[in-house]
Amino acid sequence: MEKNENCKENRFLSMDSLKKNSRFYLVAAFLAAAILALLCVGNGIWKEYRNSAVRNQKDQMLLAVESLSGRLEETISEYASDIRSMWSCSHTLNEQERETLWDTYVKEHGPVVQDVIIKKKGETILTSGTDNEPEEILSESKIDDQMCFRLVKIGNESHYLMLHYETDTGETISMILNGMAYYNKTIRPLNVGTNGYFILKDHNGIVLMHPQLEQWGIDVINGREKMFPGKNLTSLSNMIDRQKQGLTAVDEYYSYWWTKPGAPGVEKVSAYTPAY
C-alpha cells in the first residue's frame, strides 16, 4: 500500500510538473507572439518613417533644383540683357570711351565675368579683361535668334561659359564667364546633404558645371565610360534619357560616387528640371 501510495504521489507530482511546464510553454508562446507582433508593428512604423523621410528628401531636392534653375535663368538673362544694353550704348561711342565702358563692366562683375570680346567680320575690334579668346566650342544652346550660351575651352581648361551675341549691324559680342568661379560662389555653398552636389548639363548630356573640373565638357555617359572604364552605366543612361526629354522629376538609380577615389557604386536619388 505504501508502495502504491508512493506511486500515486509520484504520478501526482508528474502531472503537477507537466501542468506547470504546460503553463510555462503557453506563457512563453504568448510572450513570443506578443514580441513578434511588437516587432511587426515596430518594423511597419520604421518603414513608414523611412519612406516618409525619403519622400521629404525628394521634395526638398526638387525644390532645390527648381530654385537653382530659376536663379541660373535669371543670371543668364541679366548678362544677356547687359550685353544688349551695353552694346546699344557703346557702339555710338568713340573707341576709347567704348573700351572704358566695357573695362569698367568687366571689373565690376569679376571674377565671374572674365572677358568681353567684340569682333566684326571675324576680326577682333575690342577686348576687355584677360584677352584670352576661346579655342574650342564644347557645347552650344540657343537662347534666341541672336544669343546663344556656350561652354568653351581656353588653353587646356574647359570651365568657361560664354554668352555669344550677334548684333543687327554684323558685330559679335562674346562675354566669357569663369564657370568655376560662378559655381563656387553660387552653387557649391548650397546644402544638398553630406555627399550631394549640383550638376548642370546641356540638352545633349554635355556637362556644363560640376564640382570636379575634369568633368566639365565631357559627355555624361561616353565621357565617364572613358574616365571610369568597366562601370555599369545602364541605370544612369536611362535617367539621362528622361532628362533629355525636358522632364522635371526625381529618380532613384544606380550609379557611382564620381567625386570619391575609385568611384564606388551606390544607389542615388537625383532631382532634375530644365534650367533654361
What is each PLM-predicted segment?
Residues 84, 115-117, 197-199:
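Conserved beta-strand cores of small sensory beta-sandwich domains that regulate signal transduction
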Residues 1-21, 36, 52:
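Non-catalytic regulatory/interaction regions at protein termini and inter-domain linkers
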Residues 110, 121, 125-190, 194-197:
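Extracytoplasmic/periplasmic ligand-binding sensor regions of membrane-associated signaling proteins
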Residues 167, 171, 227-276:
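Extracellular/periplasmic juxtamembrane segments that couple receptor/chemosensory ectodomains to their
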Residues 95-112, 168-228:
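Solvent-exposed, extracytoplasmic
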